[in-house]
Amino acid sequence: MTNIRKSHPLLKIVNNAFIDLPAPSNISSWWNFGSLLGICLIMQIMTGLFLAMHYTSDTTTAFSSVAHICRDVNYGWIIRYLHANGASMFFICLYIHVGRGLYYGSYAFLETWNIGIILLFTVMATAFMGYVLPWGQMSFWGATVITNLLSAIPYVGTTLVEWIWGGFSVDKATLNRFFAFHFILPFIIAALAGVHLLFLHETGSNNPTGISSDMDKIPFHPYYTIKDILGALLLILILLLLVLFSPDLLGDPDNYTPANPLNTPPHIKPEWYFLFAYAILRSIPNKLGGVLALILSILILAFIPLLHTSKQRSMMFRPISQCLFWTLVADLLTLTWIGGQPVEPPFIMIGQVASILYFSLILILMPVAGIIENHILKW
């Protein structure tokens, strides 16, 4: 008799994805972040659902409904802070996951990589709309500034912005539709993640060497299930330390002031995980140019498979490319820091240099390094 997990139509899918899946024997902890992203998504959907039960998406009551959740709802404060800081953990895992893909050449799986880019854009859109919902000062002005960027589109820009706003400024209609989108998008993300996994399992996982591991596979369970559980416990530990000891560490104090269209905060800035893109946007003096650079800062990931010049897939045995990769990481950290600083010297110049370096590294220096390494190895 065949085991039920191998014959049952539903259990068979779970079995082939998480139990009997043949996995490379040498994948490191950098491969843990896919499962951690799944855990983050489930946690965000669950906490978000409970928050939505008490939240009201009306400009007059949104701010006080969030205060009500924290003060009067049973364990509302922990649900709210798990959701807010869970988003930060989500992005930490996302950026590490993308970085892992860059370092080890996982972008060679084109379908998986491209759906990953779509997922990244969708998660960023969801997080942006979620930040608007508490209707604090930074929520309101962040929404105003970012949506206003669309007005840089020639001819249709202004009409497009007013269409998104549902009026002539960010108001009740905007908040209402942002809440609706913020509620539905995580389910779309879950569906896309399923497709992401589907395409990954067509090819099987990459591994640190970048060489085919077909001759040396081990079952996913128990080896990688136990490894993923350890990763999950560490993620939950860090999240709980953040939530229980300094829940507002990554937030903006301005968001504890109710939204006021008549009073602009001195420094409008998004959440920390968007600061690198915000710094790139601000470093270009032209509005349309800035918007294009902002979009390209993420969309550039789609061109990476085309820019791969090395005859080796992974960077594991490519020291020049490794140096450039870690320079890119340092550059992104610099951009993140600059994004949170006021627009004044020397920050303007640092931001411009870091932005140029970001695009130069990906478009020019890394492909050139691949060619040089091929010559060094006489390939």
From Swiss-Prot:
Gene Ontology molecular function: metal ion binding; ubiquinol-cytochrome-c reductase activity
Positions bound to a ubiquinone: H201
Transmembrane parts of this sequence: 33-53, 77-98, 113-133, 178-198, 226-246, 288-308, 320-340, 347-367
Subcellular location: Mitochondrion inner membrane
Protein topology in the membrane: Multi-pass membrane protein
Binding-site residues, heme b b562: H83, H182
Listed cofactors: heme b
Pfam family, one: Cytochrome_B
Annotated Gene Ontology cellular component terms: mitochondrial inner membrane; respiratory chain complex III
Residues noted as binding heme b b566 in the record, renumbered to the chain: H97, H196
Biological-process GO terms, alphabetical: mitochondrial electron transport, ubiquinol to cytochrome c
Keywords: Electron transport, Heme, Iron, Membrane, Metal-binding, Mitochondrion, Mitochondrion inner membrane, Respiratory chain, Transmembrane, Transmembrane helix, Transport, Ubiquinone
Cofactor note: Binds 2 heme b groups non-covalently.
The family this protein is said to belong to: Belongs to the cytochrome b family.
Function: Component of the ubiquinol-cytochrome c reductase complex (complex III or cytochrome b-c1 complex) that is part of the mitochondrial respiratory chain. The b-c1 complex mediates electron transfer from ubiquinol to cytochrome c. Contributes to the generation of a proton gradient across the mitochondrial membrane that is then used for ATP synthesis.
Assembly information from the UniProt record: The cytochrome bc1 complex contains 11 subunits: 3 respiratory subunits (MT-CYB, CYC1 and UQCRFS1), 2 core proteins (UQCRC1 and UQCRC2) and 6 low-molecular weight proteins (UQCRH/QCR6, UQCRB/QCR7, UQCRQ/QCR8, UQCR10/QCR9, UQCR11/QCR10 and a cleavage product of UQCRFS1). This cytochrome bc1 complex then forms a dimer.
PANTHER family on file: CYTOCHROME B (PTHR19271:SF16)
Extra remark beyond the main annotation: Heme 1 (or BL or b562) is low-potential and absorbs at about 562 nm, and heme 2 (or BH or b566) is high-potential and absorbs at about 566 nm.
Name this protein carries in UniProt: Cytochrome b
Originating species: Lama vicugna
